[in-house]
Amino acid sequence: MARMFIRQTRTNNKITGEGYFTFRLVRGERIAGKVRQITVLNLGRHFPILQDHWPLLCSRMEQLLAPQSLLCALDCPDHIERAAQRYVAQLIARAPSSPGAGADAGAGASIAGADTASADQVAQVDQVDQADPVGAGKTAPPAPASTSDLQTVDIDSIEDSQPRSIGVEHVALHAIAQLGLVDKLTQLGINGVMRACILGNLIGRIAAPASELATWNWLQTESALGELLDVDFAGLSHMRLYRASDILMGQRQKMEAHVFGAVTSLFGLTETVTLYDLTNTYMEGQSELNEAAQFGHSKEKRSDCPLVTLGLVLDGSGFVRRSKTFEGNVSEGATLQVMLTGLQALPGALVIMDAGIATQANVDWLIEHRYRYLVVRRGGVRSFDAAQSVATQTQGGETVRLQKVMGADGKELALYCHSEGRQAKEEAMVQRFCAAFEAGLQKIVDGLSKPRTEKSVTKVQERIGRLKQKSRGASQHYQITLTPHESGKTVAALSWKKELVQGSMASHPGVYCLRTNVLDWDEDRLWQTYATLTDIESVFRSLKSELGLRPVFHHTQERVDGHLFITVLAYQCVQLIRTELKACGISESWATLRKTLQVQRRTTTSMRRADGHTLHVRKTSKAEPALMRIYQALGISASPGGVKKLVV
């Protein structure tokens, strides 16, 4: 093998005339009787290795490419070893594709230019006109007829190296191509470096949810995404990922509108149902620089951490139409008008929301802006007549009985719903609250017969008041009587009588009421439509548990907003994938699908041939049956990245 060395060349900028140095890895090769210097790899302008270490770096690379050429391992500093491993991996990844090796051999066309071997080259890629980076999302053309490549190798010399995950990345790129995200980012004037970093952030959140710093490490050491995009993430600073988040936040409204428009076109969605709800997530640290980070009621029981609130407007299919970040202690009812203003929903669109948001002021606003609404009624008296009800079934097979009652003004109706499962739950709650309240009353009674206990009328009334305050509504069902002594200053006896208040949880367990101005639907259609609101809960579970919404590690409001928005975009991609898979009978959660996809790896196998040369083969592992089923359902290649061969 011809020895390699590093050449430094001075180049002048054609526009400014400014001079600068570029670095290339070259080797000597005899052509037509003359020795020519052949560029093996462009190392860019900002090559970080000192000149004194160039020979050591080249020797280590030669050893990695042809292990038999050096009998003992070289003692290299850590930064030299990392650089050698990185550049050797690039040489193998950029080797010519094997004919007939796979339909996706060239699917990883660079989003950032033809050659992104270094950070400097990546910095220049926005000057290169690019096509679709992935090629995923379209059925791959048939591969050419496979040709045999028979070679004699030493079996004992076989080594595997550079294992990287590729399955999740491949499917995520399919979703990104379906949504046309790269074209949209290009249209918005975002250069190739930032496009690559935005995709790195997004796919990292889909495949291995973590902070930007952890994602940067994942892109370099665990993922083959760089190969699919032809981007050298090892040549990029981790700060690029943070800046990519900032740039993406600057285009939030345009990106949300584009993504929802894309899924509407792909799946033929009808914009007739709008779901709205909020959730919150907690911060790591005090986040003193973020005004939105406030202490409040944490849905994860993290009252020790400041919170931020995420509001989502979704359509009936579970895709996000709009998202916005609010303060952690925001009142739910105060957010609706902010989210729906300017939404440009179709006339008569139906808004569904729970009781926390369905204030009378919000209902009046919906009526004023000609929305239809289907909401959970806040408060009010419970009522239900089983004889006037009809039955329906939930997806879980539970029976729910429905009674429709027209309002006095004829403009709104109430749908009273009775659930057997909810009845059992509420009966247990009422029993527990009443038992605790009666135990508190009995404790007061026991104290009246003991010496040195407080028996004054005023103090006993205060104790009863505190007991009522903690009773969670159970006290309303009790009539309490205090019998004072003749002096009127102390209590002689205390008694109580339990009488259920009609129209309450105790008298009508399992009953809740929906209110709507949709008057021409039957009971079953109204309830089944309202039941789609439970889809938001599954969305929030996916965002938090599967896509890394919590916790938030950032301290400034802009970075927190960026973290949440990237998570929402990741959810859109996952929802697209799951929607396509459901149409083919695959309905697993994303956590389950991700485990199946993560099994597939891309590795380099090196072996010594009979002629003394070393053969390096970069190839993706064969898809297992469960994974193959996913690829076939999505219509994408089962061998992303193809096969690359390099003989040294």
Where are these regions (language model features)?
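Anion-binding and metal-coordination hotspots
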Residues: 3-6, 15, 21-24, 98-139, ...
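Glycine-rich, N-terminal phosphate-binding loop and its surrounding beta-alpha-beta segment
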Residues: 57-102, 112, 123, 129-131, ...
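Extended interaction-bearing regions that mediate binding to partners or small molecules
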Residues: 1-82, 86, 97, 101, ...
